[in-house]
């Protein structure tokens, strides 16, 4: 006697029109993005090792030129046996992060894009394309004022005294100065982004201009610990200019949004001439 097995009705796979991913899928995606970023950073760090000596000589050039102008010689010291090796590793890591930045920045962007709306994607892409050139411009400005800071700091050393410079501390000082100024140049872009997202209005940003200028001056004073007026002004002026430029862009954006809202709420004939 043959028995016919009851067949269970096939369940169709549920469609996901919103494009949402499960937690496990997110973790797998994150793992893949991190793995690709790590490979790019490791390869770039290996390349950075071969140029680390050239980078160190380039970083040493400003203080050597200042010392030569004063009839002195600048010598960077390594207080430990492995100090020179550790410094080259640190330089290689920094160079590797910079060289691999297009890869790991893209991986971050590719991970975030599926969860963004079209509007957020447009604003985010505009922010990235604007922030990256400004960041490198800020780094260049920090490198430009660095010799002035070195010259002023070393001028406090008497003629009968000598400065023993720790190479690692010197490198970290240069790196922090360049990065801090680079980040400062990007801050106005954050203001524009917050305005486009509807968090801050253009007039609200403009009304805080006195506080902003005071904060910028204090920031440049901290970024240039020598308290050199020339260096402070060289850093403060472009940041202040970028702040007011951000205010102008935000105000223009608010006006465009207001006009669109008027057209949406009423007919064109209702608009003022």
Predicted regions, residues:
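Membrane topogenic/interface segments and analogous intrinsically disordered interaction regions
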Residues: 1-273
């Amino acid at each position: 006697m043959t028995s016919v097995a009851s067949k269970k009705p096939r369940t169709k796979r549920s469609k996901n029109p919103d494009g949402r991913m499960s937690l496990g899928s997110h973790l797998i995606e994150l793992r893949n993005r991190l793995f690709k970023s790590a490979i790019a950073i490791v390869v770039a760090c290996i390349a950075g090792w071969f140029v680390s000596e050239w980078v160190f000589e380039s970083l040493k050039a400003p203080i050597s030129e200042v010392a030569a102008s004063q009839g002195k010689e600048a010598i960077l010291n390594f207080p430990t046996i492995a100090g020179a090796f550790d410094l080259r590793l640190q330089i290689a890591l920094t160079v590797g992060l910079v060289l691999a930045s297009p890869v790991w920045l893209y991986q971050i962007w590719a991970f975030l894009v599926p969860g963004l709306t079209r509007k957020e994607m447009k604003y985010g892409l505009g922010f990235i394309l604007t922030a990256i050139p400004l960041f490198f411009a800020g780094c260049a400005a920090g490198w430009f004022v660095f010799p002035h800071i070195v010259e002023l700091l070393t001028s406090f050393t008497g003629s009968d005294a000598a400065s023993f410079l720790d190479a690692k501390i010197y490198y970290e000082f240069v790196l922090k100065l360049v990065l801090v100024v680079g980040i400062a140049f990007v801050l106005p872009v954050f203001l524009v982004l917050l305005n486009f997202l509807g968090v801050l209005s253009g007039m609200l940003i403009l009304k805080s201009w006195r506080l902003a200028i005071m904060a910028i001056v204090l920031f440049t004073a901290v970024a240039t610990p020598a308290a050199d007026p020339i260096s402070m002004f060289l850093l403060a002026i472009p940041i202040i200019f970028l702040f007011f430029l951000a205010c102008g862009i935000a105000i223009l954006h608010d006006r465009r949004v207001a006009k669109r809202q008027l057209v949406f709420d009423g007919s064109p004939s209702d608009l003022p001439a």
